[in-house]
């Protein structure tokens, strides 16, 4: 333990270095005293019918979910997107996830089955495995473990879903005593 007298020094000039065996292991310094501008206030979302594209409907719904907006529902934006384009994979996946979070796994499965069917129409190993993984979740929560396992395994084709997919497969294997 060491005490250092810094009395009389301006706070903004302080730097503290912890050194062990000649090597810095931690360093701290003050932030400059500056008044930063306040960021602009967030703009209110347009109503779903005022938004021009399905992509913007999806992105607005995603934003509302991410920030848990108190007065707007993301579902309104996803549903409007699906009204305009029932085959939009993003909105079908988003609705499926929303219903998973609400415990409505059967309804979630309907949206996710559609998303996966559209994704795999021309490419059995789609670019993004998220809807495939999410369908696995909906099936697992319905107790349809063999189908869920197959979906989780299929989702591992995509690098972004390998960890979660293999882990979910391992969970089901352990439940079945298949170590």
Task: Provide a role label for each language-model segment.
Residues 67-68, 102, 142, 176:
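Structural motif corresponding to the intra-repeat A-B loop/turn of tetratricopeptide repeats
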């Amino acid at each position: 333990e060491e005490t250092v007298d810094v009395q009389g020094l301006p706070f903004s000039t302080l730097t503290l270095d912890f050194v062990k065996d000649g090597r810095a292991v931690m360093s701290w310094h003050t932030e400059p005293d500056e008044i930063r501008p306040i960021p602009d206030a967030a703009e209110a979302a347009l109503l779903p019918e005022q938004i021009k594209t399905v992509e913007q409907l999806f992105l607005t719904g995603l934003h509302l979910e991410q920030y848990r907006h108190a007065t707007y529902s993301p579902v309104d934006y996803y549903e409007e997107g699906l009204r305009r384009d029932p085959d939009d994979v993003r909105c079908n996946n988003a609705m499926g996830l929303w219903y998973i979070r609400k415990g409505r796994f059967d309804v979630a499965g309907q949206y996710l089955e559609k998303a996966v069917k559209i994704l795999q129409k021309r490419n059995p190993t789609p670019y993004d495995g998220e809807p495939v993984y999410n369908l696995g979740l909906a099936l697992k929560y319905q107790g349809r473990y063999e189908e869920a396992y197959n979906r989780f395994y299929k989702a591992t084709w995509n690098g972004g879903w390998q960890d979660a997919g293999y882990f979910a497969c391992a969970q089901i294997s352990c439940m079945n005593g298949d170590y």
